[in-house]
Regions:
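Intrinsically disordered, low-complexity non-transmembrane regions of multi-pass membrane transporters
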Residues: 1-14, 185-205
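Membrane interface segments of multi-pass transport proteins and intramembrane proteases
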Residues: 62-76, 96-101, 160-165
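Hydrophobic core segments of alpha-helical transmembrane domains in multi-pass membrane transport
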Residues: 30-34, 50-51, 82-89, 111-115, ...
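Cytoplasmic-side transmembrane-helix entry/capping segments in multi-pass membrane proteins
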Residues: 68-81, 102-108, 132-136, 194-195
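Transmembrane alpha-helix boundary signature
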Residues: 87-103
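Structural signature of hydrophobic alpha-helical transmembrane segments
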Residues: 40-56, 76, 100-111
């Protein structure tokens, strides 16, 4: 069985921002990603709210997972996520009511975002508190950056580009971002593949 070295904080950051970006690689949270990214204002608000929930839920999962029975662990994580989302929603409603109105139903729907529960269950519950917090920050930033990119493009081009502010435009822009990422990965790996020596087939004596 191959040995898998433990992850370092740099590995966790790299996964969240690039290698396992939740928006461009794992394709998690597509519903709010496409629906809310109509402007930088709403994209930034949802990105920060999701980041806060990810950090909080990851911290709780890392601390309490060792004392939970497998049968109730998912339910406890969902309750923790719901509590974090409620706290964030109340804070935004009190301090930024305009943003709260702009996000609408998608703010409480962070509870159902599969990204949040997936990180709590698959990573944070199996890692120490420090790595769980870093993972929450990295995944939140990775998700938020994709939101901001989509929001910026749709806000700049929305009034002059057909469908840019509508859901079909969001799908098209996300597809272009995925294509750009795949092109960059292929361009990066092509030189290493070309430099690999070819081994000629030898007849068996």
């Amino acid at each position: 069985m191959p040995y898998n070295p433990p992850m370092t904080p740099a590995d966790v950051l790299r996964n969240g921002l690039s290698a396992s970006n939740p928006g461009l690689v794992q394709l998690l949270g597509l519903c709010p990603l496409l629906a809310v990214s109509t402007s930088i204002h709403s994209a930034l608000g949802l990105g920060l709210a999701t980041l806060a929930v990810l950090v909080t839920s990851n911290a709780i999962a890392s601390v309490v997972a060792r004392w939970l029975l497998p049968e109730v662990r998912i339910a406890v994580f969902v309750l923790a996520i719901a509590g974090a989302v409620t706290s964030v929603q109340l804070a935004i409603a009190a301090w930024w009511p305009d943003l709260h109105d702009a996000l609408g139903i998608f703010l409480p729907l962070i509870v159902t975002n599969c990204l949040v529960l997936a990180r709590a269950e698959s990573f944070a519950s199996r890692q120490p508190l420090g790595l769980a917090l870093i993972d929450g920050v990295a995944m939140g930033l990775g998700f938020g950056l994709v939101l901001l990119a989509l929001g910026a493009v749709r806000e700049l081009l929305g009034h002059g580009l057909l469908l840019a502010l509508l859901p079909p435009g969001a799908f098209i822009l996300l597809g272009l971002m995925l294509a750009l990422r795949n092109w960059r990965l292929q361009a990066r790996t092509a030189p290493s593949e070309a430099a690999r020596p070819e081994i000629a087939d030898r007849p068996v004596a």
